[in-house]
Amino acid sequence: MGRYRVRVVTGAWLFSGSVNLVRLWLVGAHREARLELQLRPARGKEEEFDFDVAEDLGPLQFVKLHKEHTVVDDAWFCNLITVQGPGMSAEAVFPCYRWVQGEGILRLPEGTARLAGDNALDVFQKHREKELKERQQTYRWATWKQGLPQTIAADCKDDLPPNMRFHEEKRLDFEWTLKAGVLEMGLKRVYTLLRSWNRLEDFDQIFWGQKSALAEKVHRCWQEDELFGYQFLNGANPMLLRRSTSLPSRLVLPPGTEELQAQLEKELKDGCLFEADFILLDGIPANVIRGEQQYLAAPLVMLRMDPSGKLLPMAIQIQPPNPSSPAPTLFLPSDPPLAWLLAKIWVRNSDFQLQELQFHLLNTHLVAEVIAVATMRCLPGLHPIFKLLVPHIRYTMEINTRSRTQLISDGGIFDQVVSTGGGGHVQLLTRAVAQLTYCSLCPPDDLATRGLLRVPSALYAQDALQLWEVTARYVNGMVHLFYQSDDIVRGDPELQAWCREITEVGLCHAQDRGFPVSFQSRAQLCHFLTMCVFTCTSQHAAINQGQLDWYGWVPNAPCTMRMPPPTSKDDVTMETIMGSLPDVQKSCLQMTITWHLGRLQPDMVPLGHHKEKYFSDPRTKAVLSQFQADLENLEKEITARNQQLDLPYEYLKPSRIENSITI
């Protein structure tokens, strides 16, 4: 018995409030009390009410909500409810962060994180079991394409659960900026109708509007070997380059290149030889766009690192050797300038395909979706790992669903302008799954495997390792609050089910690629969770943001090639290059889409700065605060370093890393 102060917090998004009447009950260990209030929640408001309750409720366990409606079911987005009452040293927090709609009564448990075996009262165990049963009906797996990771069962964005949808501001920004980009694309096409299109300088006719300062530098310097090599370290795709441990077996050195062979062997001996092998593209069928055949290649690039840290190309073999064909041509920096330039353009086209499909779509978006669906199906809201992960899966299901219906769908953007479209992209993704190993998602392992540790000019590698360590400290801090021993990890049935769901269901039996099917220790759990958070945040930032800078100037990363790869160095002319590069329509669409997808989002939530209060324990707040402080310190370090560089690396500054995959 006594006075209770109840605070109701409504979301600030458009349409978060409701004209419907909301009823509340306080549920304690002894009994429950219906509160006599007339609440019609208003967007962005915190509303407080005082109530005298005649009976002793006991320790508070739940708040119950019921939104009444007659004609219109006006959904309400409730952030949280707090209650301060007799004998309570601090207010009890009841997190919600979801839409309240329909006829039912919603039960919000008190927000203290609890493991399945920690429930002193059976009522919490029954609640989490009921919650998971309902979630498993709502969040169902589906197969988008055989051989690829499972996805959320949704044919379009409207099929998604409401709590996984974009909020209204996000939806409007996404759709209106896309329309603005299409309008700009149309203006560029009209502008070029009566103008020539036979020189590289003619791309200037469409290189206006939405672009970045780095894109301007790429525009000026893209033909330079130094910038070509730099992109393998710190560009849109820093994931393919590796230090050579031997000369690749597919490298064919024709007669007369003995000096090159000696130079390659010297660089190899000195540990300065690197390679980028696009063999994954070999045999992938190229697209046919509006009746016009497009072309693909599977290049091999050999590069050396000079004493100053510059990565410079030594040779390019555009296609792998084929027993039924003459030996592939080996292109060298000493070749006629146009021949060497066209060879580099072919490499950049191949890099576009792998960056977008293997390292962006598969290794971040689809992996994050598996994590998201498994989290919703296996971890109840009271579970500490749910509370840890849920801020990092915001919007991921909708952006991926939109991708499957607009970008990589039949007739979508890839089919319209990309050389792997028309089905080749699905074959490429299926091949790439074999390379999707657990180690490949963990920078300490991946960078060690690729020989890129302690390379001073590898800025992605440096920043990724530091972010991994900062994220790992955060995860370790949270995990050790709730798992005091390895036995508790092994004995958590919900956690073990979540692990199996990711590896065996979502990733389609990925244990043969190193993914765990169970957690045997706190260290193993922490490593896996660090991978999850890193993939959904830092890794996506590194791969996504570069599109705007490196793909805006189309010749630097053409989405498609309209002529087959050259077999002779002497026949390459400017007409050959312009005939190979995308035409006006494809170039305009490439610029539009890469700007739309690569720009910083206006509603961006930086890494670690989510406002949702899923945890209520002061100890967890301290761990999160330390994470934020570590990120701030890293931001200062990166900023200071970048001030000394001609070409700053910005993608992994914590302030530019989004807290989840939202674009």
Swiss-Prot record:
Domain (PLAT): residue spans on this chain: 2-114
Activity regulation info: Activated by EGF. Arachidonic acid conversion is inhibited by (13S,14S)-epoxy-(4Z,7Z,9E,11E,16Z,19Z)-docosahexaenoate (13S,14S-epoxy-DHA). Arachidonate 12-lipoxygenase activity is decreased when PH decreases from 7.4 to 6.
Domain Lipoxygenase: 114-663
Main location: cytoplasm
Binding sites annotated in the UniProt record for Fe cation: H360, H365, H540, N544, I663
UniProt-listed Enzyme Commission number(s): 1.13.11.-, 1.13.11.31, 1.13.11.33, 3.3.2.-
Annotated compartments: Cytoplasm, Cytosol; Membrane
One Gene Ontology term of the molecular function aspect: arachidonate 15-lipoxygenase activity
UniProt-recorded name of the protein: Polyunsaturated fatty acid lipoxygenase ALOX12
Classification of source organism: Eukaryota, Metazoa, Chordata, Craniata, Vertebrata
Residues bearing PTM Phosphoserine: S246
PROSITE patterns the UniProt entry points to: LIPOXYGENASE_1 (PS00711), LIPOXYGENASE_2 (PS00081), LIPOXYGENASE_3 (PS51393), PLAT (PS50095)
Pfam family, one: PLAT
Keywords attached to this entry: Cytoplasm, Dioxygenase, Fatty acid metabolism, Hydrolase, Iron, Lipid metabolism, Membrane, Metal-binding, Oxidoreductase, Phosphoprotein
GO cellular component annotations of the record: cytoplasm; cytosol; membrane; sarcolemma
Top-level lineage group: Eukaryota
SMART domains (alphabetical): LH2 (SM00308)
Cofactor(s) this protein cannot do without: Fe cation
Species annotation: Rattus norvegicus (Rat)
Family as reported in the entry's similarity comment: Belongs to the lipoxygenase family.
